[in-house]
């Protein structure tokens, strides 16, 4: 009897330890980001049913439990049109260095869940050696992803390699699924004027462009200027998306208040040490969300009025800061 009781006690202890080691994941902050993206999508598509929603990174939101083997979260996946992913094959640890195989495999399992639901995957690899740029394009193509080999992490540059660009074509692109390549150019600092920026982009044949609503002088691109940017050099048309960070506040944006440095709102958190001027936010806070969408003065409404085809949402992985 004593042996039986001892065995029973050990069994209970083992299960108790397992419960402590493997608690159910706290999905609060992931779910709050999902809700934020879904609400942004419903608002935008309510104004323009063809408006395209592409969240970047934070691909764990593709499943209900955030696990790479989890069940697809179709409520979220159906609210978006694609996913952006940085550093998939190159740049995860260092630029121009291959991403570790285990990290690549993990991300691909999640990206494929979104892809298999009908979404388009846009990959940005940070790679500058021509041979590695070729490898990036090939590996992404083999995986069924559309990709851009960025030779500057600041995304302030149109790469001179390869020439012609990967998968160049003269088609008119009206849906994200038609895009065979894209240009990620959100930092206009090297360009002397809007005209200089527009001329540089329209001299290319990329199927899609990700850019900023604002030029470096703080002025917005007009609907007429966005319409110009939709022209490829070869006569085709491209899609144009506006970058918008929803998981961090940026102190150079129009919404930034001068007194926030000494009297910050409750939802404004610590500075991002990797990107000075960027601050973590409680992205579920109604005051922050009101800045982003839902009213005529919001950031997203400005993007819609400028004639962009969609929005490229960044810092989706902002939930990691709070977990």
Predicted segment positions?
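Positively charged n-region of N-terminal signal peptides that target proteins for export
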Residues: 1-4
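C-terminal motif of bacterial Sec signal peptides marking the signal peptidase cleavage site
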Residues: 13-16
């Amino acid at each position: 009897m004593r042996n039986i009781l001892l065995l029973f006690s050990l069994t209970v202890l083992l299960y108790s330890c397992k419960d402590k080691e493997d608690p159910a994941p706290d999905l609060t902050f992931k779910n709050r980001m999902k809700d934020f993206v879904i609400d942004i999508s419903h608002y935008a598509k309510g104004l323009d049913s063809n408006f395209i929603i592409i969240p970047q990174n934070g691909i764990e939101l593709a499943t209900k439990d955030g696990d790479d083997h989890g069940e697809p979260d179709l409520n979220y996946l159906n609210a978006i049109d694609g996913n952006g992913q940085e550093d998939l094959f190159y740049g995860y640890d260092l630029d121009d260095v291959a991403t570790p195989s285990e990290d690549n495999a993990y991300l691909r399992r999640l990206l494929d869940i979104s892809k298999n639901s009908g979404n388009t995957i846009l990959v940005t690899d940070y790679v500058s050696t021509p041979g590695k740029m070729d490898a990036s394009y090939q590996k992404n193509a083999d995986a069924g992803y559309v990709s851009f080999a960025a030779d500057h992490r600041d995304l302030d540059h149109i790469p001179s390699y390869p020439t012609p660009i990967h998968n160049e074509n003269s088609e008119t692109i009206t849906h994200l699924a038609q895009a065979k390549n894209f240009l990620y150019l959100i930092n206009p600092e090297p360009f002397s004027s809007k005209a200089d920026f527009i001329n540089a982009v329209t001299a290319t044949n990329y199927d899609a462009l990700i850019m900023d609503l604002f030029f470096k002088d703080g002025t917005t691109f007009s609907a007429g200027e966005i319409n110009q940017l939709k022209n490829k050099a070869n006569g085709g048309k491209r899609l144009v998306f506006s970058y918008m960070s929803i998981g961090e506040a940026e102190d150079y944006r129009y919404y930034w208040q001068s007194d926030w440095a000494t009297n910050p709102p409750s939802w404004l958190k610590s500075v991002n040490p990797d990107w000075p001027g960027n601050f973590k936010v409680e992205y579920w806070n109604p005051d922050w969300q009101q800045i982003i969408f839902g009213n005529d003065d919001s950031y997203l409404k400005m993007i819609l009025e400028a004639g962009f085809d969609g929005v490229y949402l960044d810092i989706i992985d902002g939930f990691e800061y709070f977990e």
